[in-house]
Amino acid sequence: MKRITCMIFLLCTVFVLSAQESAKTLVVDLKSHETKKVLVVAHRGDWRNAPENSLQAFQNCMAMGVDMIEIDLKMTKDNQLVIMHDNTIDRTTDGKGKVSDYTLAELRKFRLKNGLGRVTFHSIPTLEEVLELTKGKILINIDKGYDYFQEVYKLLVKTQTI
């Protein structure tokens, strides 16, 4: 039993270290003018197998070997940054209205819809949750986020993802 536990620990350690190294390698490739590597970018995550912009959609991307995810930001009524492409939550959740009309706690009550419009158990993630999930594993392209530059920067520092 000790041997199995040690093996699992070693495998997990190797996986975590290689994941952290992979993000660093991707940054080098992204900045290089000489690389011939094509980066695979997933717009709103793996929206075919999970609700778009859900933590599961981003987790699926990492499992598939995607290099980068593209996300969009919206600000809640209580100044929390969440991941949402549209100006309203109408299409992607079982709620209605603008993100800015709700607090984060209120938004958490809504469920994300899958690509076929069916309600799932997934909720709207915060930027901080996405940064923690993807830290050192995959690159993130933050689109529609310039208006929130200062808030994003603070979260990057807080999560040590800068």
PLM feature spans:
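Bacterial Sec-dependent N-terminal signal peptides
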Residues: M1-A23
